[in-house]
Amino acid sequence: GQDFGTAMTQTIFQPLGLTNTYLNVPTQKMSDYAWGYNKDKKPVRVNPGMLDSEAYGIKTTASDLSTFVKANMGIFPLDNTLQVALNNTRKSYFSVGKMTQDLIWEEYAMPVDLPTLQEGNAPKLILNPTPVRAQEFSAKPSSNVWVNKTGATNGFGAYIAFVPEKRFGVVLLANKNYPNAERVEIAYK
């Protein structure tokens, strides 16, 4: 087996051409590494912690994250093993309301309105126990869906959304943890 960092670098980052994506930012790239700002407006970086690499430790650029979104939409050819792995991250497991929870992503059938997206990305839903319904697996990911994921740490906030059928995606990276509702609204517009 490999450690997580080596596995991510060799099987995901390098094959996708993510040249500015790291678990540990190299010394020569530290001047490009943005400072985040916490709620007290003090500069912060992502703190090391238990499972930090696995849970929240990837540092990237908007360009590399856009490449990752394109790969998830199947816009460019990939090694079959990697494409199957990316497709598997979009297999639906559970649903709650109009949101379907995949392995990584959340999905909403199109058309979808802003209040539905905001509700599905609200702290109330994310942080509290919520009854769900099990889903049957489909052979391949749906294409006429809004796929999204929020992410944040103390000083950073991110939001990714894409609609595979339209071959359209949005990547938002901020060096402040803005509320999910604001991130979703910006992407939706």
Question: Which residues make up each language-model segment?
Answer:
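Catalytic loop of the DD-peptidase/beta-lactamase superfamily, centered on the K-T-G motif
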Residues: 9-10, 14, 45-189
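Active-site helix/loop module of the DD-peptidase/beta-lactamase fold
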Residues: 2-41, 77-81
